[in-house]
Amino acid sequence: MNLQHHFLIAMPTLQDPLFKRSVVYICEHNADGAMGLIVNKPMENLTVEGILKKLKIAPTAREPDIRLDKPVFSGGPLAEDRGFILHSAQKTFTSSIRVSDNTVITTSRDVLETLGTAEQPDNVLVALGYCAWEKDQLEQELLENAWLTSPANSNILFHTPIAERWREAAKSIGVDIHNIASEAGHA
């Protein structure tokens, strides 16, 4: 089972504050483990524009119609000082890895330098930090019913309002997340 380019959808029973009601986009999944980004937990008071200012990146050919007041996401508890940019695949950058036909993850500064310009990818999600699972750890969590999985959907990833992503990701596989029982019963 390879969950690259899938969503992990936290079950209602998952009470860890970091992962409660989370949607994690899996960027890589192989025999050594998995890596992903939480895509529905915006950081307080931090926008893409704020990140660009902190890094002293000022686009020279700024397009006024491109909004930079979008939130930066808390991608996970690891390397919270490192940026990860998920974006549409029409262009790649110095440190880009193709996750799917339509989605790329980039960690290099050159993608940030395009933000707010005509060179910017059509869809962009900026996160600080990431999630990782060691070999067989994610599979064990799936066996313990901590997560639902669904194929990733770029509309949910980039366009669905943040507060609705958890519900919409579950709905994409026919599940009403609010109707899932927290305990199994016996007949």
Swiss-Prot record:
SUPFAM superfamilies: VC0467-like
Pfam families associated with the record: DUF179 (PF02622)
GO cellular component: cytosol
Similarity remark: Belongs to the UPF0301 (AlgH) family.
Protein name per the record: UPF0301 protein ETA_28320
